Regions:
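Active-site-adjacent "subsite" loops/lids of carbohydrate-active enzymes
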Residues: 390-453
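Carbohydrate-recognition beta-sandwich/jelly-roll modules
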Residues: 47-341, 376, 383
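N-terminal secretory signal peptides and thylakoid transit peptides that target proteins
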Residues: 2-18
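Aromatic- and glycine-enriched glycan-recognition loops and surfaces
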Residues: 309-404
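C-terminal segment of N-terminal export signals and the immediately downstream linker at the start
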Residues: 3-5, 24-49
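Active-site-proximal substrate-binding groove within the catalytic cores of carbohydrate-active enzymes
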Residues: 253-254, 258-259, 305-306, 313, ...
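Active-site groove signature of glycoside hydrolases
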Residues: 343-346, 447-475
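The substrate-binding groove and active-site-proximal loops of carbohydrate-active enzymes
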Residues: 307-322, 354-367, 429-445, 468-478
Length: 600
């Protein structure tokens, strides 16, 4: 075998898997406690002496991630043709179960794994603690429930599953892809804490297709927003899968109860995803879009979204307030303004540099011009939506000290900067932006106050939250709870005003009904769009040269055949510096398509 598992160990695995099934059947057939009692010793499953290198390619054959360079103990137990092990992480180290303190016992419809004591240093040292896992057989798979206790805060608990079949992989409802011999890491939400390391999950579910009619779903049944990661390490005959639950960073939990992980087998991709999306719908209380009260009547009639690009990071102005009003007047000749939402991107000055001031900009035309843009636009029926950075603030702005305590720290304590953009094109990513947490009152009060003033002072119809889906597990407070609090308080004060987010993760569908990214992958679209609607991202190439406007992407290719429209999103038209003067014919064609789709 490629993993060089010994014949003796392999026979242990096969024997334990078969024995568990026989014992469960015999116990059920006996029907009484007396009949089952003599089989108590036999009902104990064997502890399999597996390690981190068991049943995986060593060395890796494709893309790989960091891993231990020795055989880290992963003692496991066979159940339902799979093998299960667990690792507990404190804030200082990784801890394996001590095999000498483990006991695995058949239970009605499942197996209980109990461990007294952990090991560290690759098994060379011991540490106090306990772990109890309950494996439950379901109609089509296995549920995994784990509780770990230590004498220090538990950071993370990983459930390890071996025997998962190789095949094409899909996540969060996306298309199935052949990942070959590559290792795969997926993270929920926002990459599970490392944006550019893991593939992103909008909801914690993945599916493996091993044959035309064979699908295995792995999902978390959590009802709170908490970090999940899934790591797939291939071997010759299957995957070793690590199911990682990271506890709330703002809590010190010496006992961590892991929400249920579910493994299920189905025959179609639709069935593979159906149960998970039904779970999150009920767990997070998603309202149906058709009846949800936070959708204003005008949004239900919106046939077109205009992205009006304002001022670039460098200060370059694509369209000032007066130019934007001129654009609206022309658009109103092509489609009734009351059917259009105007998205004001970077209306407040230099894109991101002037975050988080959110004040009308003099170079863009000042107060009078902005007020005219809003009021005159609304007279034509347009709805006006300015953009706000939900979790971004420039540390060099004068008011930084008042909100500095809200900068995000990951669960391990490292400060988070929004440092993944080269704003000035010096071929180096800038680091002057702090990544902010709405769960901290200072930041939430500041941002909520700026949005409230724009609504009160200028009467805007909606507000847009940039990077809305960027939840990170902070050490101070829950970003999700903070966002929900802010949105709900603004809605209570301004019930007619719409909240819109850039992108979503599952739980956000409860309180934000509109987004401009992530309209739903192939197998998720129907579920997601039952609760929310979407329009195209502001970085979508504009007609002509394909400029991304204020966004850092630069240029893309504008598709003259599709006009950058898709069936999953409200038709969207980007206006950059040359769109109105040089690309008006194409802009008119986009508007015509929007009218046709809406039956106007």
């Amino acid at each position: 075998m490629a993993d060089e598992l010994s014949r003796r160990d392999w026979m242990k695995i096969v024997g334990a898997a078969g024995g568990g099934s026989v014992l469960a059947t015999n116990s059920a057939a006996a029907g009484t406690a007396e009949a089952a009692a003599p089989a108590a010793d036999a009902a104990r499953a064997e502890i399999l002496p597996l390690t981190s290198t068991s049943e995986v390619f060593v060395p890796p054959r494709g893309r790989a991630f960091n891993k231990f360079s020795f055989d880290f103990p992963e003692p496991s137990v066979a159940f339902d043709n799979l093998r299960f092990g667990f690792i507990v992480f404190g804030r200082d180290n990784a801890y394996a179960m001590d095999p000498h303190g483990m006991e695995a016992t058949a239970t009605p419809g499942g197996m209980r794994i109990a461990c007294k004591g952990f090991t560290w240093a690759g098994g060379q040292e011991k540490h106090d603690g306990t772990l109890v896992a309950q494996l439950r057989k379901t109609a089509d798979g296995v549920d995994i429930e784990v509780t770990a206790t230590m004498d220090q805060p538990v950071k993370t608990v990983t459930s390890i599953v071996r025997g998962v079949p190789r095949g094409k992989l899909s996540s969060s409802g996306g298309d199935f892809a052949d990942v070959r011999d590559n290792e795969v890491l997926l993270g929920y939400p926002f990459g599970g804490g490392d944006l550019f390391n893991a593939g992103g999950l909008t909801t914690p579910v993945a599916v493996i297709q091993s044959a035309d009619d064979a699908y295995m779903t792995i999902s978390s049944l959590d009802d709170k927003v908490r970090t999940k990661r899934m790591y797939f390490a291939p071997g010759e005959n299957g995957y070793k899968v690590e199911l990682i639950h990271e506890g709330e960073g703002w809590l010190d939990q010496k006992t961590m109860r892991v929400p249920t992980w579910r493994i299920s087998r189905t025959k179609t991709p639709e069935a593979a995803y159906a149960a998970h999306y039904e779970h999150i719908r009920t767990a997070y209380h998603f309202p149906d879009y058709a009846t949800r009260p936070d959708v204003p009547a005008w949004l239900r009639d919106t046939a077109l979204v205009l992205t009006l690009h304002g001022q670039h990071y460098t200060g370059y102005i694509f369209n000032d307030y007066a130019k934007q009003l001129e654009i609206l007047r022309w658009v109103n000749t092509q489609i009734p303004g009351k059917r259009v939402l105007a998205f004001l991107s970077s209306w407040d000055g230099r894109y991101y540099w002037d975050y988080p001031n959110y004040k009308v900009n003099d170079r863009m035309g000042g107060d009078a011009a902005f007020r005219a843009l809003v009021t005159e636009g609304q007279k034509m029926g347009f709805r006006m939506m300015p953009m706000f950075g939900m979790n971004t603030a420039n540390k060099k702005q004068p008011g930084w000290a008042r909100i500095a305590d809200a900068v995000t720290h990951k669960v391990d304590g490292d400060e988070v900067d929004l440092n993944w953009v080269d704003w000035d094109n010096d071929r180096h990513q800038e680091g002057w932006l702090g990544y902010m947490n709405l769960g901290v009152p200072s930041w939430r009060n500041h941002l909520q106050g700026r949005i409230d003033e724009m609504i009160t002072k200028y009467g805007v119809d909606a507000y847009f939250l940039d990077i809305a889906g960027g939840w990170i597990n902070d050490t101070k407070a829950d970003m999700h709870a903070g966002m929900r609090t802010m949105v709900n308080e603004l809605r209570a004060k301004h019930p007619q005003v719409l909240a819109c987010g850039e992108m979503h993760y599952d739980a956000m569908l409860e309180f934000i009904p509109l987004y401009h990214s992530g309209g739903g992958a192939k197998y998720a679209k129907d579920y997601i769009q039952r609760h929310a609607k979407f329009f195209s991202h502001l970085s979508t190439p504009a007609p002509g040269r394909g400029s991304s406007g204020v966004h850092e992407a630069g240029f893309g290719r504008f598709n003259t055949e599709t006009l950058q429209l898709n069936a999953s999103s409200i038709p969207t038209l980007q206006f950059v510096d040359d769109t109105f003067e040089k690309q008006r014919e194409t802009a008119a064609a986009v508007i015509t398509k929007a009218r046709e789709r809406a039956g106007i």
